[in-house]
Every structure is written in structure tokens, then in C-alpha cells.
């Protein structure tokens, strides 16, 4: 689980703001004595690629294969905090302190999103030799897409018919990119539509 709304934990060399901004959280939601509140103690940190390569080597010596997860298009607030233009609104936000599901996800109509995600996947593949790469796909509300000019335009151009199928299209773009590198994709079951590529492994939770 390299990334989530609450922090991006892998060094990404091509996009350094992922680490200087995306790995820093101003507080954390906690539950104590039955009460839920935000502890404003700052939290930050990420693994360098060298550290992760060392972890991979340590695991391989013990016959363990580490499968990295980079969740898209949801659970990306840390990435969006670093690069707000990747969201539908483009508004500046902060790394999420609370748990739960955010309405802000990556914009499916923005070509820059596809470029950035592919670049990040390239760096993940450079570090992790695993046959599989997990793309998450769960808990991605479509509210922002429904009101986004670029998303609606892409939906119309591709004649997909629904925003759920737009997510299927998005995942397929990244599956094809990873397939060129000899990698296979895993996604959470609720992020896969009936028309998803049969080569994608569905993980049920």
C-alpha cells in the first residue's frame, strides 16, 4: 500500500512534490475512549527507492514476493495535494487527516493524469520486480466526474454510457501500459465492472 489519501509513502523521483507535500499530514483521526477526533500531531515520511529495493531483496531471500499497490483513481488525495491539477476541480487541498472515502479522485478526462500515473507506475516497476501490480480501484465516487467538463467530454467521445465504464477504460489504459512491461494487474472487485478485461485479477474484500 504505497499510497492513500493520508500519505504517499514511496519516493517518486520525477514528481518530487509527491514526497515534499504528499508525504506530510497535519494530523490523524483517532478513536479513544469511544470518541473520534483529529489529533493535530503532524505525521510525515516516505521510503526512498533504495530503501524499498533493500526491502525487496530481503523479502526475496525469504521467498516472499512483495506486490505493490498504487490506488487509482480513488484514494489519491496525497497525490492531488501535491499536484492539484490532477483532480477535476484543480483546487489546492491538503493530505487527508480523516479516514473514510473522499469525493475527490483523479480526473478521468485529463490527459496529464494518465501521463503522471504511467510515470509513477514506471518507477514502481523499477523498484518492484513482482509479476503483479495492484491498482486498487475501490471506493472511487463518481460525483466529481459527473460535474466535470473534461470527464463528461471523454465519456461522450468514447461512447461509454456510464462513468463506471469510464473507470474501466482508465484502468485498461494502465493495464495495457503495464502489460508492455510484462506485468499483470490486480484490482479490488468493487473497482471492476462487468466489462473489465479478463486478464485483470479481481481481489475480493
Question: For the regions a protein language model found, what residue spans apply to each?
Answer:
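N-terminal active-site wall of soluble small-molecule enzyme domains
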Residues: 171-175, 189-195
Amino acid at each position: 500500500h504505497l499510497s492513500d489519501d493520508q500519505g504517499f509513502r514511496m519516493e517518486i523521483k520525477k514528481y518530487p512534490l509527491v514526497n515534499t507535500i504528499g508525504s506530510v499530514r497535519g494530523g490523524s483521526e483517532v478513536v479513544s475512549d469511544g470518541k473520534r477526533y483529529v489529533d493535530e500531531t503532524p505525521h510525515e515520511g516516505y521510503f526512498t527507492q533504495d530503501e524499498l529495493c533493500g526491502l525487496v531483496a530481503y523479502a526475496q531471500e525469504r521467498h516472499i514476493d512483495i506486490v505493490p499497490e498504487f490506488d487509482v483513481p480513488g484514494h489519491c488525495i496525497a497525490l492531488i495535494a501535491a499536484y492539484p491539477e490532477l483532480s477535476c476541480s484543480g483546487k489546492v487541498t491538503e493530505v487527508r487527516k480523516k479516514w473514510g472515502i473522499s469525493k475527490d479522485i483523479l480526473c478521468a478526462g485529463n490527459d496529464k493524469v494518465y501521463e503522471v500515473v504511467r510515470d509513477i507506475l514506471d518507477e514502481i516497476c523499477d523498484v518492484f520486480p513482482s509479476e503483479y501490480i495492484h491498482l486498487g480501484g475501490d471506493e472511487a465516487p463518481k460525483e466529481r466526474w459527473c460535474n466535470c467538463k473534461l470527464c463528461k467530454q471523454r465519456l461522450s467521445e468514447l461512447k461509454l454510457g456510464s462513468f463506471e465504464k469510464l473507470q474501466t477504460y482508465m484502468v485498461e489504459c494502465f493495464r495495457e501500459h503495464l502489460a508492455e512491461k510484462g506485468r499483470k494487474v490486480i484490482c479490488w472487485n468493487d473497482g471492476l465492472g462487468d466489462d473489465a478485461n479478463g486478464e485483470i485479477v479481481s481481489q475480493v474484500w
